[in-house]
Regions:
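His/Asp/Glu-rich metal-coordinating catalytic cores
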Residues: 1-159, 164
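C-terminal functional module detector
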Residues: 152-184
Length: 184
């Protein structure tokens, strides 16, 4: 029932959408993506390739790259193999599902995303998922974030992110609380 509701919410959006699998819904035999028809949603592209794949939203000049998660292990590199910026796109968005690892810190956690990888990425914006608390990862080299969760209050409120990418003006990122969810 929750999945069907979620699919309808996505289908009701007036814009193209992209999605990658995460650690709770890996691309496993008999998993959620085999039990429900995500491809039936006309405005959704589900990115599943283990090595990553590129989606083009030509009407907006946008290229989106992401990678399907088959197994949530320390060997899975969510940003590994990301291609350089395509020459003919106006905006380049990346998607990755894993745990942020700050500069100089080791990690034995599954699906690590090192800050150096974020800063070296060619994306105008990098959308990250894994933990439910919102986190901005903005430096002179990169703009990335975990948007948080619109359904729970880990970190003080249910949250979502608004990203504006302007051709000659850079990327603006704002994390907002869903009204009425602040826990103070």
């Amino acid at each position: 029932e929750t999945i069907e509701w979620s699919l309808q919410v996505i289908a009701d959006q007036p814009c193209p959408m992209a999605m990658i699998p995460g650690n709770h819904d890996c691309l496993i035999e008999g998993g959620i993506y085999q039990r429900h028809d995500f491809k039936a949603i006309p405005n959704l592209t589900f990115i599943t390739a283990e090595d990553g794949e590129m989606l083009w939203i030509e009407e907006f000049g946008v290229a989106v790259w992401g990678k399907g998660m088959v197994d949530h292990t320390p060997n899975f590199s969510p940003l590994g193999g990301r291609p350089e910026r395509p020459a003919d796109c106006e905006f380049y968005i990346g998607m990755g599902h894993g745990i942020h690892v700050p500069h100089g810190e080791p990690s034995h956690r599954s699906s690590p995303i090192h800050m150096a990888e974020i800063e070296e990425s060619p994306f105008d914006y990098l959308a990250l998922g894994h933990h439910h608390a919102a986190m901005k990862l903005v430096t002179n080299e990169a703009t990335a974030s975990y948007c948080g969760s619109p359904t729970d209050t880990v970190g003080g409120a249910a949250t979502y992110a608004i990203i504006e990418i302007e051709k000659n003006n850079g990327t603006k990122l704002e994390i907002l609380a869903v009204p009425g969810t602040e826990t103070d």
